[in-house]
Amino acid sequence: MNLKSPLFLRLSDRLDVYIRLMRADKPIGTLLLLWPTYWALWLASDGIPDLAVLAAFTIGTFLMRSAGCVINDFADRDFDGAVERTKNRPFAQGRVKKKEALLLTAFLCLLAALCLIPLNHLTWLMSLPALFLALTYPFTKRFFPIPQFYLGLAFSFGIPMAFAAVGNSVPVEAWILFAANVLWTLAYDTVYAMADKEDDLKIGIKTSAVTFGRYDIAAVMLCHGGFTLLMAVLGAVIGAAWAYWTAIPIVLLLQYRQYAAIKSRVRQICFETFLANNRIGWVWFAAIFAHTFFAK
């Protein structure tokens, strides 16, 4: 194959654009979606999730996160060029057309729908509000003062879907975990929004960081605290083994470190603090994994 041929160069360019639109080169969003989904799968299956179900949720999560990123860039195409962090995205650079992005979104959603085939009808039904939330979230930044809460709903729907897929029902512990994850998402995405706060104020985009104003850090920590409290409530409801409870002091320490970091409100530090939430995700997964092991 001639690597310098016009066709190859064209295909290589489009592949690069699609990878960047999907954020396939930045897995943090997929991880933050996967952790709560895995928490739910392990709890619902008593630590032994069916491999087909696990694969369906893992692949489906990646595809829907990718679709969400593409439609987000489509929605923000007139603003990204004015924001320091997003000025090099494909739309901001004029490298992608609107129709192209919409077709890519539809294709990714279709692939994600195929992941539902081995799952039950209740899971299919619950995928509809999940799809609606994922595709409409980017547009809430025009009118909703706390779009990060809406994102929290979208990022949490994998939890009841996981319980539905495993047990064909959505018990109370699923909704406790759902509420906890909404608060966690609101916390870390507000930190993410703090990194863009100055730019968002200039262009008129609504975010929780803008809405909370000088109380943004207090709001973040209240959400973190509520998240941890609900995880403790969840532990009490499920009769968690001792290993589950070891996560709480570790997570509290990680949350305190985040507080110490974001007090500076420095753009890069806020972004790095957002990334650090991956640690909280895997700590809770390890705790739930250990709980299901020792509870047997």
Swiss-Prot record:
GO molecular function list: 4-hydroxybenzoate polyprenyltransferase activity
Q: Which Pfam families is this protein grouped with? A: UbiA
Q: Which GO terms describe its cellular component?
A: plasma membrane
- Cellular compartment(s): Cell inner membrane
Q: Name one GO biological process term.
A: ubiquinone biosynthetic process
The EC number on file is 2.5.1.39
Keyword Membrane applies: yes
How does the protein associate with the membrane? Multi-pass membrane protein
Task: Give the pathway.
Answer: Cofactor biosynthesis; ubiquinone biosynthesis
Asked if Magnesium is a keyword of the record, the answer is: yes
Reactions mediated catalytically: all-trans-octaprenyl diphosphate + 4-hydroxybenzoate = 4-hydroxy-3-(all-trans-octaprenyl)benzoate + diphosphate
Cofactor(s) required for function per UniProt: Mg(2+)
Q: Which keywords does the record carry?
A: Cell inner membrane, Cell membrane, Magnesium, Membrane, Transferase, Transmembrane, Transmembrane helix, Ubiquinone biosynthesis
* Alphabetized PROSITE patterns for the sequence: UBIA
- Give the transmembrane region(s): 28-48, 51-71, 102-122, 143-163, 174-194, 212-232, 233-253, 274-294
User: Could you say which enzyme class this protein belongs to?
Assistant: transferase
Q: What does this protein do?
A: Catalyzes the prenylation of para-hydroxybenzoate (PHB) with an all-trans polyprenyl group. Mediates the second step in the final reaction sequence of ubiquinone-8 (UQ-8) biosynthesis, which is the condensation of the polyisoprenoid side chain with PHB, generating the first membrane-bound Q intermediate 3-octaprenyl-4-hydroxybenzoate.
Family annotation (PANTHER family): 4-HYDROXYBENZOATE POLYPRENYLTRANSFERASE, MITOCHONDRIAL, PRENYLTRANSFERASES
By sequence similarity, the record places it as follows: Belongs to the UbiA prenyltransferase family.
Protein name (database record):
4-hydroxybenzoate octaprenyltransferase
Question: What is the scientific name of the source organism?
Answer: Neisseria gonorrhoeae (strain NCCP11945)
